[in-house]
Amino acid sequence: MATQTVNGALLHYEERGSGPPLLLVHGTGAYAGLWSPVLDELARTYRVIAYDRRGFARSASAPRGGLAEHARDAAALLDALGAAPATVVGWSGGGVFALDLAALFPGRVAALVLAEPAAHLTTHPTRGALAMAARSGFHRRVRRDPAAAALAMYQWAGGYKTGGNAFDTLPQQWREQMLAHAPATLREMDQMIRPYPTRAAIRSITCPVTVIEGDLSDPAFVSANEFVTSLLPQARIVSLPGAAHMLHIDQPERWVEVVTQATGHAPAPAAVPSRHPQ
């Protein structure tokens, strides 16, 4: 894994392939290693860049910053690698920063692919999310036992409507790494309590946007998807059968198909009809 210093932060990244640039932005609590189920297949078509955001995994020693720091980091990394404009794929919290990147630095983004972006998630909590918080004593554990609080969040976010969750099935190394940076996860979650980016910022985005939605995901993520697409008339939602919030891990082959279709490298699938008022 290579390194690049941007905005005073030493970021670790991995690069594969030689096609059009594709930047992968991981979610809150995740890290670049979780893209491994799709990296090789994506590299057949794209120049893929996957990095650990500041505060996570191998970039954990980077100075902490606010939420906007992640968009600035991504823009600077693309510039340093000569990879702009790129298709930017943001998963969960990474989708929030992908939106921010497209709003703040539109010239760096050719298109957005958002895998259940967790934008304004706290403005539409669901019974599942509230039950997770109550059952785990989430708010009490945040300070007393960060790893336990992060575990509860990971299990809820990766949960299937049919029962069980994807987090518990991940390789042990991945789970251990995600729990190791629990404090960074909880700090970022706390920062995301306020709606971010603003509605005006999201509305300013003009590039093509595809939102990927798992048909087994918690309704909170479905609501977030609808919120984002309600602000972006050019956006469309594509459903991924058999997947919950860890979409590219649950259904890696189909996930790659959706990404390649979204960027014009394959026939486009049928979009899910809009569920929000016009």
Regions found by a protein language model. Give the residues of each.
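Flexible "cap/lid" loop of the alpha/beta hydrolase fold
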Residues: 103-104, 109-142
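Active-site loop/oxyanion-hole signature of alpha/beta-hydrolase fold enzymes
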Residues: 37-40, 49-89, 93, 257
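Conserved alpha/beta-hydrolase catalytic His-Asp/Glu region
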Residues: 144-186, 201
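Catalytic histidine-centered segment of alpha/beta-hydrolase-like enzymes
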Residues: 240-252, 256
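Conserved catalytic-core motifs of eukaryotic protein kinase domains, centered on the activation segment
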Residues: 34-36, 59-64, 124-125, 222-223
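Conserved serine/cysteine hydrolase catalytic core
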Residues: 176-230, 236-239
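Hydrolases whose catalytic domains are alpha/beta-hydrolase-1, hotdog thioesterase
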Residues: 97-101
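Conserved HGGG/HGGXW glycine-rich cap/lid loop of the alpha/beta-hydrolase fold
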Residues: 6-61
